[in-house]
């Protein structure tokens, strides 16, 4: 049965307009993005099929083009649309964070860092640069690849902190495995960067590790 033949209250688009996006299932949200199904398969049925094939909504959203395009109903055009939507979401969070007078909400920082790093298929390391009132100056990804004390150069972090005229920084990196548990290498790296930045009077406020669930704060664990 075509979605057009469904009761209006059950159609994803009408349901979203009446109840808000949070009321929709992953499949219903994806169906709105897909817009149409394929022969013998409504957009909602296709969405359910895709979620089953990828294993989760997150896996679908983070898929790279070659894998994404192998699935029925998807291709380069849909991939481009999806990347545009994800980038708009990241920029929205960045703009919202910059509008805040100061970083008074740890949750706002967590939400922002999740949006920036969770989609990354490989390890990346970045810095959130702040002024003396902890207002956001910039966020930059500085290193990509295996993140450890040998691959992250304190001199480069210091250079970018000075270029942004930062008074403080929040360090962050992701664990693509999804496990947020800090390693000994993470603790060593954090201390090296704290020592280097202290020489130019820039404070390291925290180091967040992004994986599945909520980003982990090393400061909250007492490891700063």
UniProtKB/Swiss-Prot annotation:
GO biological process: proteolysis
Residues reported to bind Zn(2+): 173, 175, 186
Ranges where the MPN domain occurs: 102-224
Keywords per UniProt: Hydrolase, Metal-binding, Metalloprotease, Protease, Zinc
InterPro entries, A to Z: MPN, RadC_JAB, RuvA_2-like, UPF0758, UPF0758_CS, UPF0758_N
Pfam family, one: RadC
PROSITE patterns according to UniProt: MPN (PS50249), UPF0758 (PS01302)
Motif range (JAMM motif): 173-186
A GO MF label: metallopeptidase activity
Entry superkingdom: Bacteria
Record PANTHER family: DNA REPAIR PROTEIN RADC, UPF0758 PROTEIN YEES-RELATED
Stated family: Belongs to the UPF0758 family.
Protein name, as recorded: UPF0758 protein Pmen_4376
Organism listed in the record: Ectopseudomonas mendocina (strain ymp)
């Amino acid at each position: 049965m075509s979605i057009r033949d469904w009761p209006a209250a059950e159609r994803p688009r009408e349901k979203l307009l009446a109840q808000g996006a949070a009321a929709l299932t992953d499949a219903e949200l994806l169906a709105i993005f897909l817009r149409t199904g394929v022969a013998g398969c409504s957009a909602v049925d296709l969405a359910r099929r895709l979620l089953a094939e990828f294993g989760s909504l997150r896996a679908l959203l983070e898929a790279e083009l070659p894998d994404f395009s192998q699935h029925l109903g998807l291709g380069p055009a849909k991939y481009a649309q999806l990347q545009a939507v994800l980038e708009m979401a990241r920029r929205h969070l960045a703009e919202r964070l910059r509008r805040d007078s100061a970083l008074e909400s740890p949750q706002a920082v967590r939400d922002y860092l999740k949006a920036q790093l969770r989609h990354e298929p490989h390890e990346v390391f970045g810095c959130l640069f702040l002024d003396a009132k902890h207002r956001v100056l910039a966020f930059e990804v500085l290193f990509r690849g295996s993140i450890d004390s040998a691959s992250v150069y304190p001199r480069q972090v210091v250079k970018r902190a000075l270029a942004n005229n930062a008074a403080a920084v929040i360090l962050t990196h992701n664990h693509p495995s999804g496990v947020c548990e800090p390693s000994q290498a993470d603790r060593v790296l954090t201390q090296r960067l704290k020592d280097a930045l202290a020489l130019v009077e820039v404070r390291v406020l925290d180091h967040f590790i992004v994986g599945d669930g909520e980003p982990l704060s090393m400061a909250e664990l007492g490891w700063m």
